[in-house]
């Protein structure tokens, strides 16, 4: 069985144990059900010597199954130099060689499952720590990400990882608190969510899942364990990943397609599976809206802007090689009526291309579409005239970045190209209400930004303030 990677239409189960005895009666059927359910890749995770061997065999047999090798903390007491050398040999021999590898051979994508488990204490804690450190050093030597198991061992896990030099990997089946998640992400680690997020009593995990920034989110089954609702109590399997994905989508207020795209991209990037998108998208869908990415240029250099940190928003590559023509934008849109809104909002300031915005907006309106512009409010400063009358009748709503309660704060965080930018934004907001039916302003939760003062400023201007959470884009 082979699987083509089409971001947004498949899922990757980043952690399961297909080699375990629980799958002996029907392993072939389990793998087929996963394939049929849209699972584009499966990573089967090693935990002991036999499990590592079984995972490697599966990865050689199936094009879309990958493996990791490592030794679980439960079994750390049995770890020997001979076992370490065997793991190192496997990792070296079968290490995935390049991001686009689709051939049999290089199928080891990580070191794991490794870590600490202070809940069961099946192995003495000092031995767990020593074995953990040794495998982290192996991962660093080979340049492979690590798959970390941490249960009731927050302090030691974070201290050991922080001191190891390893800065890529995943905290699998996350069960810690928000502080642990934030500290793990600060090092560079992803947070993986499994079946327990579907449980009614998993309130803490659900809150954390809703708050994880897109770039750090992964999903998994941990099959045969931790079966999600509505199959809780049965043996878990990769095909059930869809139920975890649905719960995650609902918690984050996005579509299932969005979660597929976000988590698949993150898994591909972390584990070097498949081919990453190489070209920036002109039109990209999030939930029921279509967003238009028509320029990467901007008259602000906001410290919080995602374009300085990543090429991706909700799994969409927005780094343009060239600015699109009107015809290219129309082709990318297709039928405007199929979307709730079409929003001019990319990695730059759309009103820098005012003529294109006007022409495309008029084209959308003629085809029963709704138009919104997300702007920094510099339009009148850019053109040294009031451009808002030109948008009347072709723009249904506009969202303007207020971003600060005063000029000093605005200049500090937004670094505008214009000397009197803040005053220009306030004037733009006042004028917008004369020509566009729906006007709102936004501000991001940043140190130094007084949200209540921003709300007061918005009230004086006669518009509603929408507060945006830092790192929550799209």
Where are each of the predicted segments found?
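N-terminal pre-triad scaffold of radical SAM enzymes
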Residues: 1, 277-308
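Mid-domain alpha/beta scaffold segments of enzyme catalytic cores
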Residues: 1-271, 289, 304-311, 317-331
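Structural recognition of alpha->loop->beta junctions
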Residues: 90-94, 106-109, 163-171, 177, ...
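Conserved radical SAM core fold
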Residues: 115-119, 224, 312, 350-351, ...
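Short beta-strand/loop segments at the ligand-binding rim of alpha/beta enzyme cores
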Residues: 143-145, 166-169, 365-377, 436-441
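Short, electropositive alpha-helical surface patch
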Residues: 158-171, 271-278, 357-364, 450-467
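Canonical radical SAM enzyme core domain
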Residues: 315-330, 350-393, 404-405, 445-453
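Auxiliary Fe-S-binding modules of radical SAM enzymes
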Residues: 325-337, 342, 421-474
């Amino acid at each position: 069985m082979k699987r083509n990677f089409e971001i947004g239409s498949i899922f990757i189960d980043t952690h399961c144990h297909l080699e375990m005895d629980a799958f002996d009666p029907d392993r072939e059927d389990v793998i087929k059900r996963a394939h049929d359910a849209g699972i584009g890749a499966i990573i089967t995770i090693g935990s002991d010597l036999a499990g590592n061997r079984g995972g490697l065999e599966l990865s050689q047999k199936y094009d879309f199954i990958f493996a990791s090798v490592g030794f679980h903390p439960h079994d750390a007491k049995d770890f020997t130099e001979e076992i370490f050398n065997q793991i190192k040999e496997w990792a070296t021999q079968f290490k995935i060689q390049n991001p686009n590898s689709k051939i049999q051979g290089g199928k080891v994508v990580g070191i794991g499952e490794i870590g600490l488990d202070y809940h069961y204490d099946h192995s003495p804690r000092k031995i767990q720590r020593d074995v953990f450190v040794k495998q982290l050093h192996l991962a660093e030597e080979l340049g492979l990400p690590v798959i970390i198991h941490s249960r009731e061992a927050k302090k030691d896990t974070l201290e050991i990882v922080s001191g190891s030099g390893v800065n890529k990997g995943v905290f699998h089946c996350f069960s810690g608190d928000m502080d642990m998640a934030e500290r793990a992400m600060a090092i560079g680690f992803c947070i993986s969510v499994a079946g327990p997020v579907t449980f009614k009593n998993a309130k803490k995990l659900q809150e954390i899942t809703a708050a994880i920034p897109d770039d750090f989110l992964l999903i998994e089954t941990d099959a045969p364990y931790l079966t999600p609702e509505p199959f809780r109590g049965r043996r878990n399997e990769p095909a059930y990943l869809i139920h975890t994905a649905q719960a995650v989508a609902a918690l984050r207020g996005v579509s299932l397609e969005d979660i597929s795209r976000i988590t698949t991209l993150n898994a591909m990037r972390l584990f070097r599976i498949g081919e990453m998108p190489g070209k920036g998208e002109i039109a990209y869908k999030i939930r029921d809206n279509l967003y238009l990415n028509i320029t990467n240029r901007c008259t602000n250099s906001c410290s919080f802007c995602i374009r300085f940190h990543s090429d991706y928003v909700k799994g969409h590559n927005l780094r343009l090689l060239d600015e699109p023509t009107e015809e290219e934008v129309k082709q990318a849109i297709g039928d405007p009526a199929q979307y709730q809104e079409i929003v001019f909002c990319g990695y730059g300031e759309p009103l820098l291309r005012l003529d294109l915005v006007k022409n495309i907006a008029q084209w959308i309106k003629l085809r029963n579409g709704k138009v919104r512009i997300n702007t920094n409010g510099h339009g009148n400063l850019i053109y040294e005239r009031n451009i808002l009358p030109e948008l009347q009748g072709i723009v249904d709503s506009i969202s303007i970045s207020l971003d600060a309660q005063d000029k000093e704060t605005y200049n500090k965080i937004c670094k505008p190209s214009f000397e009197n930018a803040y005053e220009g934004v306030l004037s733009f907001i006042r004028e917008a209400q004369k020509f566009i039916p729906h006007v709102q302003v936004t501000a991001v939760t940043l140190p130094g930004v007084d949200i209540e003062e921003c709300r007061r400023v918005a009230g004086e201007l006669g518009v509603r303030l929408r507060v945006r959470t830092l790192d929550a884009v799209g």
